[in-house]
Amino acid sequence: MLRLLFGFLVTCFLLLPARAAEPQYAIFAGGCFWCVESDFDAVPGVLETISGYAGGKSANPTYEDYAKGGHREVVRVKFDPDRVSYAELVGVLFRTTDPTDGDGQFCDRGFAYTTAIHALNERQAMDAKAEKIKAEAELGRPIVTPVEGAAKFWPAEDYHQDFGKRNPIRYWYYRNGCGRNRTVEKLWGDRAYAGVSH
């Protein structure tokens, strides 16, 4: 009887669904946060994106003053690590930007629009550096995107969130007028937008 009960309990335990991994976060700068948000929203396994500011010294930055405070435009990405790895997300950042440009991105110039990876822990820093080495080998030229430590994330104003979804025509004109897709496709060839499903 005990053996039967034990067998039943083991079977019940084995039939329990596996516990899903806790969502994780990443913070990436890739130029205009409208575009970065739109690209990462199209990555399977990404649960949420929020546009914002990070890396500067000023508190509570706004769109009017974030650059003066030393911040970049960034996107905080919430993701399911069972579906997409942090390393894969770093690869998406590289292949949706021009990480060889240290002066901005596309038509947006200046430090506030430069690329950066804010690693939130040592594991993320290691993965980001490894992906950077791979991407440099693939391009055959240096990538200037720095891997920096964690920085306080400040969400941008509501009107910046999901901008491409809420303002598709204005967004399309901005993205195409800025030359983002054209430049990324010229730089990366058939690897442009790898990992993005739109």
Swiss-Prot record:
Coiled coil (residue ranges): none
Instruction: Give the superkingdom in one word.
Output: Bacteria
Which keywords does this chain's UniProt record carry? Oxidoreductase
Positions annotated as active site in the UniProt record: 32
Q: Which SUPFAM superfamilies does the record associate with it?
A: Peptide methionine sulfoxide reductase
Q: Which reaction does it catalyse?
A: L-methionyl-[protein] + [thioredoxin]-disulfide + H2O = L-methionyl-(S)-S-oxide-[protein] + [thioredoxin]-dithiol; [thioredoxin]-disulfide + L-methionine + H2O = L-methionine (S)-S-oxide + [thioredoxin]-dithiol
- Any Pfam family from its record, for instance, is PMSR
Please cite one Gene Ontology biological process associated with this protein: protein modification process
Tell whether Protein transport is among the UniProt keywords.
Answer: no
Family matches, as InterPro entries:
Met_Sox_Rdtase_MsrA_dom (IPR002569), Met_Sox_Rdtase_MsrA_sf (IPR036509)
Q: Which GO terms describe its molecular function?
A: L-methionine:thioredoxin-disulfide S-oxidoreductase activity; peptide-methionine (S)-S-oxide reductase activity
> What Enzyme Commission number(s) appear in the record?
1.8.4.11
Q: What does this protein do?
A: Has an important function as a repair enzyme for proteins that have been inactivated by oxidation. Catalyzes the reversible oxidation-reduction of methionine sulfoxide in proteins to methionine.
Describe the family membership recorded for this protein in Swiss-Prot or TrEMBL: Belongs to the MsrA Met sulfoxide reductase family.
NCBIfam families per UniProt: msrA (TIGR00401)
The record's section on HAMAP family has: MsrA (MF_01401)
Q: What is this protein called?
A: Peptide methionine sulfoxide reductase MsrA 2
Q: Which organism is it from?
A: Rhizobium meliloti (strain 1021) (Ensifer meliloti)
Upper lineage: Bacteria, Pseudomonadati, Pseudomonadota, Alphaproteobacteria, Hyphomicrobiales
> Which gene underlies this protein?
msrA2
